[in-house]
């Protein structure tokens, strides 16, 4: 079995728990409130703004034996640079206060997720950062592919309010193809273990973030 497939199998339970959260089920059906979508974008901003700094830190800490992976990190940084501004633009386009979000604080789960990743790079195995990529890009593909259009229609919002989510559908599908190839090149058991561990932690904390988002009152009533 390839390592990419091993990773998916090892994190199957965590992924199942995330995608079966009530608010994720709501999102995949397009049944989310404007408050829910704005809250999601705010938390997205609080982790997306760290993507490039985290990748830079990871690239700097990779050993020479993983020079091929450092090259991939550089390419990933180029693709991801500036995406936090897309999120702020979307917040403004759906009537939110992007200045308040930019100057605000993340939820505890996002604070812990970002802190865990910086600490993993600094004190542990920097390859583990690719566990984050597994979770966030896999989730964004599902939301962009199956939820963005129906949420936009349900909330009657312009396409300019979905630049982050919609663009990450096609972009992250391409990224995940590259990601699969990169993960299948990882041979060291310690590197593989670090990716699996980080993926499990990020799934847990990312799910906690979604649990903290406000739900659509109609969806809650229907589920009751």
Predicted regions and their residues:
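Non-heme di-metal
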Residues: 1-224
């Amino acid at each position: 079995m390839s390592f990419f497939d091993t990773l998916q199998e090892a994190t199957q339970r965590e992924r199942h728990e995330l995608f079966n959260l009530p608010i994720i089920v709501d999102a995949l059906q397009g049944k989310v409130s404007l408050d829910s979508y704005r809250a999601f974008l705010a938390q997205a901003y609080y982790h997306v703004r760290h993507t490039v700094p985290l990748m830079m830190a990871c690239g700097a800490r990779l050993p020479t034996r993983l020079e091929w992976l450092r090259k991939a990190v550089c390419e990933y940084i180029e693709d991801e640079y500036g995406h936090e501004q897309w999120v702020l633009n979307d917040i403004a386009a759906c009537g939110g206060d992007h200045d308040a979000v930019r100057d605000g604080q993340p939820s505890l789960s996002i604070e812990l997720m970002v802190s865990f990743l910086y600490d993993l790079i600094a004190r542990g195995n920097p390859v583990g950062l690719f566990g984050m990529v597994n979770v966030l890009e896999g989730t964004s593909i599902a939301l962009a592919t199956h939820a963005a259009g129906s949420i936009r229609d349900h909330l009657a919002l312009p396409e300019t309010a979905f630049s982050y989510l919609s663009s990450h559908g096609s972009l992250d599908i391409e990224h995940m193809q590259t990601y699969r190839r990169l993960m299948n090149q990882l041979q060291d058991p310690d590197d593989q273990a670090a990716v699996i561990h980080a993926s499990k932690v990020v799934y847990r904390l990312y799910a906690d973030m979604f649990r903290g988002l406000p739900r659509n009152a109609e969806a809650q009533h229907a589920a009751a």
